[in-house]
Design a protein with these regions (language model features):
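Beta1-alpha1 glycine-rich phosphate/pyrophosphate-binding loop at the start
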Residues: 5-74, 157-183, 253
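Phosphate-coordination loops involved in phosphoryl transfer and adenosine-cofactor binding
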Residues: 4-6, 80-81, 143-145, 200, ...
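Glycine/small-residue-rich loop that forms an oxyanion/phosphate-binding "nest" at active or ligand-binding sites
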Residues: 78-143, 147, 152
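A Rossmann-like FAD-binding core segment of flavoenzymes
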Residues: 71-90, 95-96, 101-102, 164-262, ...
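Glycine-rich, N-terminal phosphate-binding loop of Rossmann-like dinucleotide-binding domains
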Residues: 12, 111-112, 237
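FAD-site-proximal beta/loop scaffold in flavoenzymes
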Residues: 119, 125-141, 237-287, 291-294, ...
Length: 307
């Protein structure tokens, strides 16, 4: 008879492996399904300085490996597999993957959300080499330097404000002639002496040698192009949660995030959503880790009532 796990975690990022650690340490049988490698999006971050315990910071890949090892130390099992189909409504949850079918009494969804790329040639190769998607995560090394932010919504405005406090110069590039961000951001950005707006502009090329050296901007109305020198660009044009698998069963918000409050419980009992994939105000490594621990607390309550 195939094993039925107490908990199956989908996704091996910080939220997923924290859930696995807490559950395994509590004596639950735990399987983590990860399609690539430990760390999730965090693994792409060159330097993490805002996660406690590392006085010199740590790279995301190494931190992801450490989280995996911590969970496996207490008996959690990792399977490198991609989930193709999820049946979550029953008392026993069934997941069909590239490596076979797995069953669990509870499921923790930690599939994350990916930044939407600009789609400019060379973008992927320059990630971590001047191309970034999170100012709070990756902005610190650019203190006193020239940076650019692409986008016009709340996240772009917040990134530009964050960077304006440390960078020598911040270019905010937006394809329209005004910000879509809420009004609370407008006055501080307009008042910042080191923020320059590039309205009605898109990025047509990334200039680089071994690292990013600048951007080629194209006028939306004129089609004219010009080059802009900068040490980094922070792309903030939205995020895409990895929730397509769950659309037919779970309640999602209009942006595709799984609706779950601070308990991490979803619209299906025994199913929890943690980290960047759920509705929440702040998406950071520390908040993802918190979600993982909280999910196990409520999963244990559920298991005690449904054995």
């Amino acid at each position: 008879m195939e094993q039925i796990y107490d908990m199956i975690v989908i996704g091996g990022g910080p939220a997923g492996y924290t859930a696995a650690l807490y559950a395994a340490r509590s004596g639950l049988s735990v399987l983590v399904l990860e399609k690539l490698s430990a760390g999730g999006q965090m693994a792409l971050t060159e330097q993490i300085d805002n996660y406690p315990g590392f006085e010199d910071g740590i790279d995301g890949f190494t931190l992801g490996e450490k989280m995996q090892q911590s969970a496996e130390r207490f008996g959690a099992v990792t399977e490198l597999a991609e989930v193709y189909k999820a049946s979550l409504s029953g008392r026993i949850k069934t997941l069909e993957t590239s490596e076979g079918v797995f069953q669990g009494r509870t499921v923790v969804i930690a599939t994350g959300a990916s930044p939407r790329p600009l789609g400019v040639p060379g973008e992927e190769a320059l990630v971590g080499k001047g191309v970034h998607y999170c100012a709070a995560c990756d902005g610190a090394p650019y203190r006193g330097r020239t940076v650019a932010v692409v986008g016009g919504g709340n996240s772009a405005a917040a990134d530009a404000l964050t960077l304006s406090r440390i960078a020598k110069k911040v270019y905010l590039i937006h394809r329209r002639d005004s910000l879509r961000a809420t009004k609370v951001y407008h006055a501080p950005l307009m008042a910042a002496p080191n923020v320059e707006f590039c309205w009605n502009s898109t990025v047509s090329a990334l200039l680089h040698e071994s690292r990013l050296t600048g951007l080629r901007l194209k006028g939306v109305n004129t089609g004219a192009e010009h080059d802009l020198s900068c040490d980094s660009v922070f792309i903030s044009v939205g995020r895409a949660p990895a929730t397509e698998l769950f659309r037919s069963e779970l309640a999602l918000d209009k942006s595709g995030y799984i609706i779950a409050d601070e308990s991490t419980r979803t619209s299906i009992t025994g199913v929890f959503a943690v980290g960047d994939v759920r509705t929440k105000a702040l998406r950071q490594v520390v908040t993802a880790v918190s979600d993982g621990a909280v999910a196990v607390h409520y999963a244990e309550e559920y298991l005690a009532e449904n054995r």
